[in-house]
Amino acid sequence: GPLTEDMSMVERIEFVKGPAGFMLANGDPSGFYNVVTKKPSGRNKGEVGISMGSFDLYRANLDLDGKFSEDGKLLYRINVMGQLKGSHRQFDFNNRYSVVPVLKYLIDDKTSVTLEYTHQFSEVNVIGSNYIFSKKGYADLPRDFTTAEANLAPTKMNDRSLLVIFDHKLSNNWKITAQAAYFNYQQQGASLWPQWPVAFDPQNDSILYRGMSIWDVLGTSKIGQMFVNGEVQTGAVSHKILAGMDMSNKEYYHDWNQGGALGGEFNIYAPEYGNATQPVFDRTKSIRERGVRYYDGYTGLYVQDELGFFDDALRLTLAGRYTTLKTGDIYSGDFKSSRFTPRIGLSYSIDKNTAVYFVKDESFLENYGSDWQQKSFDPITGGNIEAGIKKDWVNGKWNSAVSVYQITRNNVLTADMDHPNPAGGYYSRQSGQQKTKGVEVDIRGQIVRGLDVIINYAYTEAKVTKDSEKGNIGTQVPGSSRHIQNAWLNYKIDMGALTGFGISAGYQYQVKRSPWFVFDGSENSLPDYFRLDGSLSYQKEKIGFNLVVNNILNKYLYSGAPYEDYFYWQTEPGTNMRFSVSYRF
């Protein structure tokens, strides 16, 4: 759903790239990540945790896992979380709770049905209150600055979903899986943004004119997937086959058509809160009556065969997907398009510790919205070419991976600077191509007993290669960084009086960062980014303690972009901490 999954319900997060990207999915050429939620394990166990921290953070979570029936056929798992959380920004908060019950029924030793329900609720300050605006440039105001007021009505979000999974083992080598999901998202709130077309007083850069508009949303999604996978042998060649179909239908209603000024003049350098008059919104009609309807959907057929040669030392993957996309709204009408996208991959195990691979993949994705003439946008097309090598060292204590890639995206949307949108900002236009070339290096291993390290480096050259505005060609793609380097050290004592004690530290370093959105032919690079974090932990049998400290150096960290004739950015908190206690039973 639109709300990010709370970590209390997450088992693990899988970052999918390289040969692993050959999955039954309508995916982006740059890869994707997969969130795996907690499922019943068949064991009776549980965990409870309590956290407190900076900015009035209070949080509790409960994880229960077990069997409903004595024969072990009916399993359950339930995760419950509640959180009250302030912010480093004035008047800002994020209060939320989630309830995630899961049932799994083992019909027999070959068949199972899983039913998962998720309800997440979030209450935050008015949307947009986390942005800072100034005509003088980035970091011109304190990181706790806000344009919001203390008495604004909160924005409330309810995100509900129901997932059903059916698994059946056809034989020892073949399996069929069917999944169906329904998502329902409801939001009632408002958005805070500078007024348009005049955000700042032309005679005084200190005076900002704030605007506030309604932002109510109703979204429903129906998603289905069915596939079969298995293995066969034809002579000396093995085959790992995956074939299936997936489809979705999504419908959204948005209301942002009511709004007005939030108070009068607002001095960003000497703000006075509590005197602003708020616009009043009319919600007597349902969101379906007053909102604008958008919909999109797709149907895809997919087949893949991984052929293994020389006892599977050499693996050739051939795959193809046929996708039909459909989108529509009252402005641009209905749009439908179909395309076949092939995939090919080759990997070879040089020895038991070393493997090389090559991947060529194409993509076909919907493009939402319309231009100033209400013409629908063509789908995004593109492709990924990637090659790499993976190797284990020192009997598996160290492993490394190096890859090079080029990602191409066509029909990219950019701002149409010739056609302002009366509702604010600019219309979009479809005129671009972006190419991203890069190198990624991942290293992890054990330095000495108990001391582990993870090191990542990524060099990314992301450029605009085609654009109707010639001045944009050759500029860095908005929102990208040329260099990103991370490292994380973790030391855990496993003997002696201090057994169970651990200490960790790590950093992230970004160089030559591009702003979120730049459309004027320049790059307007953001300053380099460096953040240092650390933690202390102690595990004693069933009870654990953990202290996390973020932004240890208390740096003013932010990201942003130029907009109209001013700048806007989001800040990260200064040094902050979180202390957690957990108990397993």
Task: Indicate residue ranges for each PLM-predicted region.
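Outer-membrane beta-barrel translocator/receptor signature
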Residues: 8-11, 22-99, 107-111, 160, ...
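Acidic/polar loop-and-plug regions of large Gram-negative outer-membrane beta-barrel proteins
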Residues: 83, 87, 100-169, 184-219, ...
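Structural signature of Gram-negative outer-membrane beta-barrels, strongest in the C-terminal barrel
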Residues: 106-108, 219-221, 238-242, 246-250, ...
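Surface-exposed extracellular loop regions of Gram-negative outer-membrane beta-barrel proteins
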Residues: 123-136, 251, 334, 347-429, ...
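Face-selective signature of the C-terminal outer-membrane beta-barrel domain
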Residues: 162-185, 210-330
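Membrane-embedded beta-barrel scaffold of Gram-negative outer-membrane proteins
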Residues: 167-181, 185-191, 381-446, 452-465
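Gram-negative outer-membrane beta-barrel transporters
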Residues: 429-517, 553, 580-584
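C-terminal beta-signal and adjacent terminal beta-strands/loops
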Residues: 508-518, 537-585
